[in-house]
A protein has these predicted regions:
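PAPS-dependent sulfotransferase catalytic domain
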Residues: 1-181, 191, 227, 231-234, ...
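Non-catalytic, well-ordered alpha-helical segments in soluble enzyme domains
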Residues: 47-49, 190-205
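Substrate-binding strand-loop-helix patch
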Residues: 186-188
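Short, well-structured alpha-helical segments
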Residues: 207-214
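Short acidic/His-enriched helical or mixed secondary-structure segments at domain edges of catalytic enzymes
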Residues: 215-236
Length: 301
C-alpha cells in the first residue's frame, strides 16, 4: 500500500493499489518535463528491440501513466486497469508520483529522471502553448516566463511542486533496484546512460543493439514519428520541445536566479541541490565506475 496518498485533478495514487506487480516490472518515474517519454522509448528499445510498440499505436498505450485519471488514452479507468493487467512481459509503467506514494516492490526496477528546476520550469511554460485547450483550458499560459516562474517555484503551477518529488526519490537512491538519471547526463552522454539502464534491467546489449537504441531514441526520430510519442492532451506536433538545457539564462533576471540558488538548497539540502543543478554522477556510481576500471586494468590480456 502507498505510504502517502496523492490526489489532484490529474492523479490518484491509489490506482496503483489495483495493479498486481510482476517480477519483471519496470517503473519509469519523474516529477515532469525531465525526459520521461525519452526514457520510455529507451526502455522500450532495450526490452523489445524495435519501435513497433508491440502493435500499440503509441508509447502511452504500451507504457501507461498509471495514476493519471481521467486518462484520455482510455475510455474508462476500468478499461485502463484491464489494459495494464493484460500488457505483455516486460511491462514498463510510467508515474509522476513521489516514491512514498507508490506501493514499493523490491523486485521492480525503478528509473527516476531528474532535471534542473530552471529547465523544468521553462519546459513546462513552453508546453502550455501546446495544450489542447478543449481538454485543458485552465492550463493555458498567457503570462511571461518570469511571471510564471514566481508562481511555479513556490507552488508547482500548473501541476505540483518539484522539490518534494525529487527528495522522496533522492532518499532511496542507494536501493539496488533504483536508478537515478539526470537529464543533463542523458542528453550529454546518452550512450553511458543507456548502458546504465541496460545494466539495471539485466539486458545484454551488443554494438548493433546499442546503435539502434541511440538512433530510435534520438530527438529527430521521435519528432519525425511524433504520433507514437505525443502525450495525450497536446495539439498535433506540439509535445516535443528543443530538448536543450540552459535556455532560461536569457529569460530570468539575476535576482530570480540568485533566489533559486538559495531556495533549492533550503528545499533539498546541499548535496541533492548541487546534483539537481549540475548533473554528473553520484558518488556511489562514480565509485562503481572506478572499481570497474581497476578490474579491467588488472585483467590479463
Amino acid at each position: 500500500m502507498n505510504i502517502v496518498e496523492v490526489k489532484n485533478k490529474y492523479c490518484d495514487s491509489t490506482i496503483w493499489n489495483s495493479v498486481s506487480p510482476r517480477k519483471t516490472d519496470v517503473v519509469i518515474a519523474s516529477c515532469y518535463k525531465s525526459g520521461t517519454t525519452l526514457t520510455q522509448q529507451i526502455v522500450n528499445l532495450l526490452l523489445n528491440g524495435n519501435s513497433d510498440l508491440r502493435g500499440y499505436k503509441s508509447i502511452h498505450e504500451l507504457s501507461p501513466w498509471v495514476e493519471y485519471n481521467p486518462d484520455p488514452t482510455f475510455a474508462s479507468l476500468e478499461l485502463k486497469l484491464n489494459h495494464i493487467e493484460n500488457l505483455p512481459e516486460s511491462r514498463f509503467l510510467k508515474t509522476h508520483l513521489p516514491f512514498d506514494a507508490l506501493p514499493y516492490n523490491p523486485e521492480t526496477k525503478y528509473i527516476y529522471l531528474v532535471r534542473d528546476g530552471r529547465d523544468v520550469a521553462l519546459s513546462l511554460y513552453n508546453a502550455g502553448g501546446g495544450y489542447d485547450t478543449s481538454l485543458y483550458e485552465e492550463e493555458k499560459v498567457e503570462e511571461t516566463f518570469p511571471e510564471f516562474w514566481d508562481n511555479w517555484l513556490e507552488t508547482g503551477r500548473h501541476l505540483w511542486p518539484l522539490w518534494e518529488n525529487i527528495l522522496s526519490w533522492w532518499r532511496v537512491r542507494h536501493l539496488p533496484n533504483v536508478l537515478l538519471v539526470h537529464y543533463a547526463n542523458l542528453i550529454g552522454d546518452k550512450p553511458k546512460e543507456v548502458e546504465r539502464m541496460a545494466e539495471l534491467l539485466g539486458v545484454k546489449m551488443d554494438a548493433a543493439k546499442k546503435d539502434l537504441v541511440l538512433e530510435e531514441s534520438s530527438l529527430e526520430y521521435m519528432t519525425e514519428n511524433w504520433e507514437k510519442f505525443q502525450s495525450p492532451g497536446f495539439l498535433p506536433k506540439r509535445f516535443f520541445g528543443k530538448g536543450k538545457n540552459g535556455r532560461w539564462k536569457d529569460l530570468l533576471p539575476q535576482e530570480k536566479i540568485e533566489k533559486y540558488e538559495v531556495f533549492i538548497v533550503d528545499k533539498l539540502g546541499i548535496e541533492c541541490a548541487n546534483w539537481v543543478k549540475n548533473g554528473g554522477y553520484l558518488p556511489g556510481l562514480i565509485q562503481k565506475a572506478l572499481d570497474d576500471a581497476i578490474e579491467e586494468a588488472m585483467t590479463p590480456d
